[in-house]
Amino acid sequence: MRALDNGEVCIFVGGTGNPFFTTDSCAALRALETSCDVILMAKNGVDGVYTADPKTDKSAKLIKTITYHEILDKKLKVMDATAAGLLEDSNIQIRVFEMKPENFLKVITGDSMGTLITK
């Protein structure tokens, strides 16, 4: 936690080591513990949240902004419900984007690529 206290950017990866806790729940817990403003969620092969699975539905459309409530209501498979509930209650946003090396720098410098999930 010294790095956070010094204003450094910290990247958390992995799980909690507890059964029944997904990596989504782990990310939500770490975000709460460290008073994060936003979670950066890099996805493999998809560049944000879509109205349907873009790999199987050609009519799927990228959603630029969506709420946690809408994700749960529409049963979009972005994250597990426990993590979504924790983050919604805490007003922590998520930026979902495609996991490419060049995208990390773009996102942390303010690029609005992908999807923003808000309260």
Which positions does each model-derived feature cover?
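C-terminal catalytic "cap/lid" subdomain
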Residues: 1-119
